[in-house]
Amino acid sequence: MMMSNLPKDLVEEILSRVPFKYLRAIRSTCKNWYDLSKNRSFANKNIDKAAVSGEKEFLMITQFNVFWVGVNLHRSQNNSFDLSIQLKAKIVSRDKKDDLFQKSQVIHCNGVFLCVREKMLVVLNPYWGQTKRIMPRPPFGCFDRYALGYDKSSGSHKILRLFGVNQNNLNIYDLSSSSWMIPDGTLERDMEYMKQGVSLNGDTYWYAKDKESIDWYLLCFDFTRERFGTPLPLPFSNEGYTLHKGYKSLSALKEEKLAVLLWDTMVIWVTNKIEPDAVSWSIFLKLDMEPSIYCRYGNFFIDEEKKVAVVFEKDSSSWSWMYNPNYNKAYIAGENGYFKSVNLLKSPNTLQLGHLVCSYAL
């Protein structure tokens, strides 16, 4: 029987086993395979495959290259954990260099990446092999803030632009219609600070503070209703915290939950429920350490099943860390005080990591 005559489900299963880096070659082989590889059910098979393997996927940006990176945690016989990191595919290389990732703010949502350049936006979908350049509406501002999400009713991706002196003027770009629009809703707050947002279930959440409030909070933009939600409480007291004291990081978990890491106490909370206007939290992990670890630029992810968190960080033992674009340390923290520091330059099965944008999901 020829491959073209095989049942659709069987072809999906076969193609889902093809490594990501070979998919483009597969698509060019047969029109039916090309159409099938862009089918949502085929994408879901890849999502399920990654979930079963327990592998975490990231987009890694170095000076000249962009890679797909797979990160795996392995439990050893003595209940310790080992970290292995694998380069899965090269997305952009020196040979076909495009400077869209250089000096860019890179935002991720559901497998799509938004690269924010001066007076230029670039949307990249590595899975489909698509790139789209978008001109923002004037006036341009160096403090303009962007977010990427999608309409849950239509599935269409949208770009949110916050601009103006207080970053409370809004524009929305709809990728399905290739057009900018001014939404009915506004941000009725003069924002003092908004950390780069995290996409979760099509919406974007920021760690934020406005000029009138004393406390920091979570702020959500709902891309389906095209409006901001009410400020959501964080799971800890904000008293005495500044931008750098009590530094916090956000991370999405399987497009279902949001995790927040408070660096100075090394406590991780995970949402039990999260919506644009409601949130509840529970402690996932607390690490009692003296002295505490100072982390400033780290990415982190958690493995709920193994009850482990992995934090990627720059080595701050010398002043060179301020100018080093790479993550060269990893901290693995778990239950019962488990803690392990990994030097990514010296450990087997690891490598020095460039800028990690996000955990990837199709």
Swiss-Prot record:
SMART domains: FBOX (SM00256). SUPFAM superfamilies: F-box domain (SSF81383). It holds the Pfam family F-box. Kelch repeats lie at residues 150-201, 293-341. PROSITE patterns: FBOX. Residues 1-50 form the F-box domain. It comes from the Eukaryota. Gene3D superfamilies: 1.20.1280.50. Keywords: Kelch repeat, Repeat. InterPro entries: F-box-assoc_dom_typ1 (IPR006527), F-box-assoc_interact_dom (IPR017451), F-box-like_dom_sf (IPR036047), F-box_dom (IPR001810), SCF_F-box_component (IPR050796). PANTHER family: BNACNNG10540D PROTEIN, F-BOX PROTEIN CPR30-LIKE. This is Putative F-box/kelch-repeat protein At3g20710.
